[in-house]
Amino acid sequence: MSISTKTRNTSSINLIRESARDFALQYIKPYVMDWDENQHFPKEVLQKAGEYGFMGILVPEEYGGSGLGYHEYVAIIDEISRVDPSIGLSIAAHNSLCTNHIYKFGSNDHHKKYLKLLATGKMIGAWALTEPNTGSDSGKMASTAVKKGNKWVLNGTKNFITHGK
């Protein structure tokens, strides 16, 4: 069944949207200017988002996630971004670029080790694509990952790492 013909429960999506709006108004809006002026990255609000299920939107419940779909994902990110686009982007990057990649492409061991921590906001996911000489052109990346025994050795340089220090 294609997405265009799949029936969605719009009343449940509206409830999720309302929950995200309430979250943003209570935990983000009062602090936005202070965070911006002081260049503060509010890890505490991302942890609170985890309590609301917003850090594991697409992760199945068996791994501590919300087990929701992309329609709910869009509604949550939309409402949070209306109050603070940077927090919306952080939650979207965490869910899509890190957590969802581990869920879709990680091993069972990766699922067990990382997904619950990520889905609950106890761990914040990062993303490292950009390299100094190639920008974000993934086809020209120079970094490598080579398996040595039962471990992987990473070689290369990254910059502009989303959620990196």
Regions found by a protein language model. Name each.
Residues M1-A92, D109-K113, L117-T120, I124, ...:
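Amphipathic, small/basic residue-rich leader segments at the start of a protein or domain
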Residues G88-D109, G135-S138:
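N-terminal glycine-rich flavin-associated loop
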Residues D34-N38, E61-G65, C98-K104, T130-N133:
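Conserved short loop/turn motifs at secondary-structure junctions
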Residues G65-S66, D109-K165:
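Glycine-rich, Trp-frequent "lid" loop and neighboring beta-strands that shape
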Residues Y52, I77, K104-N108, T130, ...:
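Short alpha-helix boundary/capping motifs
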Residues E61, Y70, I102-K104, G139-A142:
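Surface-exposed beta-strand edges and their flanking turn/coil or helix-capping segments
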